[in-house]
């Protein structure tokens, strides 16, 4: 399955909620004011959604939020199921612990897609907990561990898009499970987030039900 490169707002309209795929400069409800209906000629279906369709839709929504493809998502689920604790919560914690997502959460990218691009272009450096040196990385899916430090490399620190992203993050707020110093353009991954720290609009139990069939 190829990565979607079409209009991002259309995906949010299809799911009926803001997936965070756009920068957030203009509020989601303003951008969709002309039509809150899903895209397409007929908009909302009159047929009641089946249990399976609701489960599948929730999986699609989460995949789109984090920019993860089908096989990769299935692998995350398998790993989450092997871990101790609630599978759905483990799944979300793993997705939130991805390097590209943390770069976004820290405010160095205005969207996850932009954060992913920063990582792919080797703009981001990581210092593993207990190590003394930063290393440049280009793999967005790296799973961060407690105490890992992220920084923007020196020659990229004046990029306008990074400065704009920090302004947006200041308005959005930084999660409690991260410690960020925007003046130094670096931050620490303190720990994986608990469920209370994660997006409330996600119903991970539907995804667990889907994979349990």
Swiss-Prot record:
PROSITE patterns: RIBOSOMAL_S4, S4. One of its GO terms (molecular function) is structural constituent of ribosome. Residues 97-163 form the S4 RNA-binding domain. SMART domains: Ribosomal_S4, S4. Residues 44-53 have a biased composition (Polar residues). Pfam families: Ribosomal_S4, S4. CDD domains: S4. Residues 16-53 are annotated as: Disordered. GO terms for cellular component: small ribosomal subunit. GO terms for biological process: ribosomal small subunit biogenesis; translation. Keywords: Ribonucleoprotein, Ribosomal protein, RNA-binding, rRNA-binding. One of the primary rRNA binding proteins, it binds directly to 16S rRNA where it nucleates assembly of the body of the 30S subunit. With S5 and S12 plays an important role in translational accuracy. Belongs to the universal ribosomal protein uS4 family. NCBIfam families: PRK05327.1, rpsD_bact. Part of the 30S ribosomal subunit. Contacts protein S5. The interaction surface between S4 and S5 is involved in control of translational fidelity. This is Small ribosomal subunit protein uS4. It comes from Psychrobacter cryohalolentis (strain ATCC BAA-1226 / DSM 17306 / VKM B-2378 / K5). The gene is rpsD.
């Amino acid at each position: 399955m190829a990565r979607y490169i079409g209009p991002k707002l259309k995906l949010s309209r299809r799911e009926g909620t803001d997936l965070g795929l756009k920068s957030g400069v203009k509020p989601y409800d303003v951008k969709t004011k002309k039509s809150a209906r899903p895209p397409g000629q007929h908009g909302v279906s009159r047929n009641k959604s089946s249990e399976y369709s609701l489960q599948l839709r929730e999986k699609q929504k989460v995949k789109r939020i984090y920019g993860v493809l089908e096989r990769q998502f299935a692998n995350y689920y398998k790993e989450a199921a092997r871990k101790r604790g609630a599978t759905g919560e483990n799944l979300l914690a793993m997705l939130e612990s991805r390097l590209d997502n943390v770069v976004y959460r820290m405010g160095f990218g205005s969207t996850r897609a932009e954060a992913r691009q920063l990582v792919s272009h080797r703009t981001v450096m990581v210092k593993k907990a207990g190590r003394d040196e930063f290393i440049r990385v280009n793999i967005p899916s790296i799973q961060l561990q407690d105490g890992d430090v992220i920084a923007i490399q020196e020659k990229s620190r004046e990029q306008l898009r990074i400065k704009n992203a920090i302004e947006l993050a200041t308005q959005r707020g930084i999660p409690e499970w991260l410690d960020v110093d925007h003046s130094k353009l670096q931050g620490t991954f303190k720990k994986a987030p608990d469920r209370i720290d994660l997006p409330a609009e996600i119903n991970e139990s539907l995804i667990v039900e889907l994979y349990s069939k």
